[in-house]
Amino acid sequence: MKFPDFIFVGVVLANLVLVGYLGIGDYQRGRLVADSQQNGEQIVAWFENFALKFQDGSAISPQSCIPISEEAPGQKGAKINTWKSCVEDLYGNDGPFHQYTNLLIPKAPAYAAKCDKHELNSSGAFIFEKLTANPAGPPSAGPMELGEKLLGGINIRLSLCDTGYYLIKIGEFKL
């Protein structure tokens, strides 16, 4: 074997090592995205259970997530809960989602307003979107603003912002 043959074999081995390293990294990120999706499915199930408890009149916690009905009598002057207070209680230390974190970027928040390439911390975050009925077609989706009032019957979609800053739709629920 001549010297150029050794260089060729060295380059081939280096490429194999690089492909293996990149493949392992992609697999690990994919596993974290799949784990986040499972966490999101549990969040959707929790909200569906929350809605059932609300309809039955059972005790509900946290109180800050209880929507107010627009048609219900006797609720004039009642405090209207906002999305900010609800999501802070849900992800707070005593909230049901306190164990859910951003698995892709552990120092980033677990939820974000939108999936944005310019907001690097939104990768791996849960995105809550308000769905608005559209008579001409499918509902339009927009971010749940922190000041959004929680009214009964509001439709919300939960998505996950993946590593490429694209939304992975997990599920929809109704408050």
Model region roles, listed by residue range:
Residues 47-101:
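Short, glycine/small-hydrophobic-rich surface segments
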Residues 119-175:
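Short, surface-exposed interaction loops/tails
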Residues 43, 47, 156-158:
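Hydrophobic beta-strand residues in large extracellular and virion-surface proteins
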Residues 1-45:
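Amphipathic alpha-helical segments typified by the pilin-like N-terminal helix
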Residues 76-80, 107-108, 154:
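Residue-level signal for mature regions of secreted extracellular proteins and peptides
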